[in-house]
Amino acid sequence: MKKKGLKKTFFVIASLVMGFTLYGYTPVSADAASVKGYYHTQGNKIVDESGKEAAFNGLNWFGLETPNYTLHGLWSRSMDDMLDQVKKEGYNLIRLPYSNQLFDSSSRPDSIDYHKNPDLVGLNPIQIMDKLIEKAGQRGIQIILDRHRPGSGGQSELWYTSQYPESRWISDWKMLADRYKNNPTVIGADLHNEPHGQASWGTGNASTDWRLAAQRAGNAILSVNPNWLILVEGVDHNVQGNNSQYWWGGNLTGVANYPVVLDVPNRVVYSPHDYGPGVSSQPWFNDPAFPSNLPAIWDQTWGYISKQNIAPVLVGEFGGRNVDLSCPEGKWQNALVHYIGANNLYFTYWSLNPNSGDTGGLLLDDWTTWNRPKQDMLGRIMKPVVSVAQQAEAAAE
């Protein structure tokens, strides 16, 4: 099925020099002000160490996966200013895309205004990731790392390429798990963004079966850091016994018969991606019953996982430019927001950035003004966030 094409249209300088030497690093510990504690799953819930359900309001902030090797927007504003705004708007979870090429010794950060970001001067890309995690933790914002692509040039169908083989994919994940294992600001790993094409589920083919690969990588990560959540996206079709087409990363029908099973229990979170007609036309958008037909499609494709109490569902990407109920994209977005809220699912909205070509962002093109119509829509499913200071005060009472 024709997916969304180049959904994430970036305005970057394409400098694609490949290398394989990782930057040296020192494991980064949690700042005293960071959010404390890790999470695990309990049926379809994500809960903390005391069994209290997590209250996440999430978004994506991309850039580290691109040839800029840094977060987008730092050419306009400071990292501190942007994180302050994210927190002010009620978000406490960032899905942070990266590429394996980020860690190559030849990769250098580009397009940063160092007058606005003097503390980033001289830092290499992974140190910029460190800085984002440090600053997010100081604000009570937690991080899910997202292996978005192998090389910075574009998406890949499978979790590996000739230049970035499976061994590199896993070794980088283990490196990150070790680097942040003492820092509960980082709570999870989204193993690979949007498997599609050749990627299969339940076929048993070691070179294409994404479920088996997710188990290999998930177990490798948990052998280093058993506290992380492991987020597993779907495929687009090619599911054993069911070749129905869906969005890249969105088809999780295979979980019913072929679930991901890890050595450490209660760590798997399934994370579909879902988009609207502003990204690509799909048959269900042309159904006369649209948008009333959508909940049944979501139930069948990925929503059943939560409804049947198999595991939590975190919708890792969804977004679009228009939220007006007078247009198809607005009808789709509002219907999905209602579905997420009605079924108590988790989400990370795509995206903070305005420079995602066919979805836009929560920021407008000036990189400063918040998109109020989108925020008003998402506000219906955003949960009250208790700050670290408030938690400490409550514990002292």
Curated annotation (Swiss-Prot):
It comes from Paenibacillus polymyxa. The active site is at E194 (proton donor), E317 (nucleophile). Its EC number is 3.2.1.4. Belongs to the glycosyl hydrolase 5 (cellulase A) family. It is an enzyme of class 3 (hydrolase). InterPro entries: Glyco_hydro_5, Glyco_hydro_5_CS, Glycoside_hydrolase_SF. The keyword Transcription regulation does not apply. Keywords: Carbohydrate metabolism, Cellulose degradation, Glycosidase, Hydrolase, Polysaccharide degradation. Pfam families: Cellulase (PF00150). GO terms for biological process: cellulose catabolic process. This is Endoglucanase. GO terms for molecular function: cellulase activity. It catalyses: Endohydrolysis of (1->4)-beta-D-glucosidic linkages in cellulose, lichenin and cereal beta-D-glucans. Disulfide bonds: none annotated.
